[in-house]
Amino acid sequence: MLKAEQRLYRFSANLGFLWTHLPLDEAIIRAADAGFDAVECHWPYDMPASQIADALEATGLSMQGINARCGDRAAGEFGLAALPGRQAEARADIDEAIAYAAAINAAAVHVMAGKSDASPAAQQCYRDNLAYAASQAMPHGLTILIEPINRMDVPGYHLSYVEDGVELITALGFENIKLMFDCYHTQIMQGDICRRLTANLHHIGHVQMAAVPDRGEPDAGELFYPAVLAALYAAGYQGFVGAEYRPRDTIDAGLGWLAKFKQAGGR
C-alpha cells in the first residue's frame, strides 16, 4: 500500500532523443509500447499537427511539451528569445508553437532563450518575449517553460541557473510561466538536486532526467535517481518526469530502468 504522501511516478519519453529514426507519429506508438506514460518532443513541425493528434489519441498518451523553434541550428543558434533584434522572428516562432501545441492538446511550450551576451538589452528582450508568450498561451491553457541549460554543452546560453529562472518567473508574475528543471543540466552547473527541486517546487512545471556526465540512461552515473524521484514526489510533485537521454546502446537494450523506476514509485 502506498503511503499517504507517496505519488505514483510517471515518465515521459523525450522523442527528441528516443526513436529519432522513426517518423514522430510512429515514435509515439513505440513509446506507448515501451510503457511510457506520456511523450514530449523538440520540434514537431515537419509533421501535420492532425497526424500527431491522431497518434496521441490512438495510444492514450499526452504530449507534455514541445519547443518553439530555436533559430538557425546549423549556425549554432539555440533559441531566439533573448536576442535583441530578433524579436519579430522569436514571436512568430512562439505563435507557431502555441498554435501547434493547442492543436495537439499539449501541456506546455518551451521558449528557448538562446546564446546571448547577457547584456541589459538581452535581459529585457527575454523578459518581453516571455511576457508575450505567456499572454498568448493563456487562452489555450498552455504553460510556458524556461529551462536552465548548462554552459559546458551550450556555451553562452542565456539562462543556466535555477535561481535565476525562479527570480525571472517571480518578477514576471505570470502563473503560466514555469521552470523546466532538467536534472542533468542542473547537476553539471550547480548540483544539490534534491534540495533545489523541493525548494522550488511551486515554480516547476516539468522535470527531466538523464545520467551525468554522459547523458545516458538514468540508472547509471553520478546522480542516484531513485533518491531524486523519491524526494521529488514526496514533496508533492504530481507531474511527469521526462526521459531526455541518449541511449548508450540500442533504445530497447537500455529500457530496463523504466520498469524498475515505476516499481519503486508504486506502479
Give the positions of each predicted feature:
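N-terminal small/glycine-rich loop or linker at the start of catalytic domains
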Residues: L2-L15, G65-A81, H110-K115, I149
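Conserved beta-strand positions in the central sheet of alpha/beta enzyme cores
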Residues: E40, G65-N67, H110, L145, ...
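Active-site acidic/histidine proton-transfer and metal-coordination neighborhood
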Residues: E5, L80-K178
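Histidine-acidic metal/acid-base catalytic patches
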Residues: M1-S12, F17-G35, N105-A106, L159-F181, ...
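Active-site-proximal loop/turn and secondary-structure-junction residues that shape catalytic pockets
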Residues: F17-W19, Y45, R69-D72, A113-D117, ...
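Active-site-adjacent beta->alpha loops and helix N-cap segments on the catalytic face
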Residues: D46-A55
